Regions:
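C-terminal non-catalytic scaffold/interaction domains in large multidomain proteins
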Residues: 1-343
Length: 343
């Protein structure tokens, strides 16, 4: 929480006091500056006064203009300068949510007063939320443009299913920020800039990727299972997967439900009795017979030992299970040299 030298609520009170009664009421209602921090819509304010939404908007805009022209506004220049310096420290461009939460996370009324000071203050420029970015404010057009363009490039270079540690994403981000002043290249500022993007996101394990990806936008048990197995780094029993989901994400995961989700999702491959791995690790899907077929299809005729060696890299099974499957003459044939091939 930031400690401000001025008191935002007192500052706003002085600024709105220069307005006529109706203008003051419109501003207080519109920005949630009264006892109730709820903000009223143009329509609700219009209904209260029996005027149109457009008329309310005109009164709001005129009131802001009058405040900016007032002696009270001039007198509060040090307050606006303090906010501007805080913006500079936080990175020059920051999401509205992050900035207000930096001031306070508990006092909604105080947040509303700070927000109003950003609206009337001349150094601050708002960029509305769109498909790419959140609501954000900045104090430097050129910097804002560079940061947003760098975030676009960062997103374009991410594969849909890619996950990166935060340190690696920041390193990649810096590659696109070479023209930005060194003073901004601090980790906490770079993280704030990353949070501006709606296209890039962070999963519950702190790994970054494309925001709409299942690996980042985690919904159901199968998505949590994917992250749990990926974190484990090697094949794991479905019962342990359920335990890992509960431990890592504080989510209830019934063993049977978890097992069913692992069976249904192509991201997972059964590699032994109850043991699951990720398909992206290169494990072949299917029963042992299918794995032998895929191995022979890729490598051609192989000796019994070579087949066992290659299948055991894909499956946690007994050697005898592989040998039994090789006796299936419908699928496999043995030549004079003792090598096996597809029938």
């Amino acid at each position: 929480m930031a400690n401000l030298a001025f008191k935002p609520k007192q500052t706003v009170k002085k600024l709105v006091s220069v307005l006529p009664q109706r203008g003051r009421d419109v501003i207080i209602s519109r920005y949630g500056l009264g006892a109730n921090p709820a903000k009223l819509t143009l329509e609700a304010i219009g209904d209260k006064y029996g005027i149109t939404r457009e008329r309310v908007r005109q009164i709001e805009n005129a009131s802001i203009t009058n405040i900016r022209k007032s002696a009270a506004f001039k007198a509060e220049e040090p307050s606006f300068e303090e906010l501007r310096k805080l913006f500079e420290v936080l990175g020059g461009i920051i999401s509205e949510e992050d900035f207000l939460n930096h001031i306070t996370t508990k006092d909604k009324s105080l947040q509303n007063h700070i927000h109003f000071l950003l609206v009337v203050g001349s150094p601050f420029k708002k960029l509305k939320e769109d498909e790419e970015f959140k609501h954000r404010w900045h104090i430097n057009d050129e910097l804002a443009k560079k940061v947003e363009e760098s975030l676009r490039k960062l997103y374009k270079n991410l594969a849909d299913d890619e996950l990166l540690p935060e340190s690696e994403l920041i390193k990649n981000f810096l590659e696109h920020l070479k023209d930005v002043a060194e003073e901004y290249k601090k980790e906490e500022i770079l993280k704030r800039w990353l949070s501006l993007s709606k296209k890039i996101g962070k999963n519950p394990l702190g790994e970054w990727g494309v925001a709409h990806s299942k690996n980042v936008h985690v919904k159901g048990i199968r998505d949590y299972a994917y992250l749990a197995i990926r974190k484990h780094g090697s094949p794991i029993h479905f019962k342990e997967v359920a335990k890992a989901i509960a431990t890592m994400f504080d989510k209830k995961a019934h063993v049977a439900t978890t097992h069913n989700e692992l069976i249904k999702d192509p991201r997972f491959v059964l590699v032994g009795r109850g043991l699951y791995a990720l398909a992206e690790w290169g494990y072949l899907s299917g029963v042992v017979k299918d794995v032998i077929s895929k191995v022979l299809g890729k490598h051609g005729a192989l000796s019994k030992d070579d087949i066992i060696d290659k299948v055991l890299k894909e499956r946690y099974v007994k050697k005898n299970t592989i040998l039994v499957n090789l006796q299936n003459t419908k699928h496999f044939k043995k030549d004079k040299e003792g090598k096996y091939a597809l029938a």
